[in-house]
């Protein structure tokens, strides 16, 4: 969004990545006027590891307690993931499972893999 010279905003969020989009979503939920700006047009690609662990959902659930199941319903954008496997050049591997702090949090997969373009766009439009 581009603000004209006549528009005044008390809150301006610079950057519509995950942090900026989440801040905007929380402000919108509370009915607090603000402006979210970014130098890029969305959706846009961003280099990233693309993994969303359970720690991400600790924050996302504060916005929407059902967000894990909503993301899980979009399987073409958010692939379920139960952990990570690191493989060394010599072929040795290390499995790192995603774990939940409580069994109540396991209403879906422990995490997701999603291209950053799709994750950012999802949050930006939330």
How would you label these PLM feature ranges?
Residues 6, 80-126:
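Conserved N-terminal helical subregion
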Residues 25, 29, 58, 125:
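Short, well-ordered alpha-helices that flank and scaffold nucleotide-derived cofactor binding pockets
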Residues 16-19, 23-24, 28:
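Small-residue (primarily alanine) positions within well-ordered alpha-helices
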């Amino acid at each position: 969004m581009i603000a004209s010279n006549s528009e005044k905003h008390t809150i301006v969020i610079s950057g519509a990545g995950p942090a900026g989009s989440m801040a905007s979503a929380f402000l919108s939920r509370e009915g607090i006027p603000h402006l979210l700006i970014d130098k890029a047009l969305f959706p846009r690609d961003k280099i990233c590891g693309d993994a969303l662990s359970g720690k991400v959902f600790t924050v996302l659930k504060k916005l929407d307690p059902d967000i894990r199941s909503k993301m899980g319903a979009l399987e073409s954008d958010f692939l379920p993931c139960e952990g990570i496997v690191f493989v060394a050049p010599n072929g040795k591997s290390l499995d790192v499972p995603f774990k939940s702090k409580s069994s109540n949090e396991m209403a879906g997969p422990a995490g997701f893999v999603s291209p950053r373009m799709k994750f950012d766009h999802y949050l930006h439009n939330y």
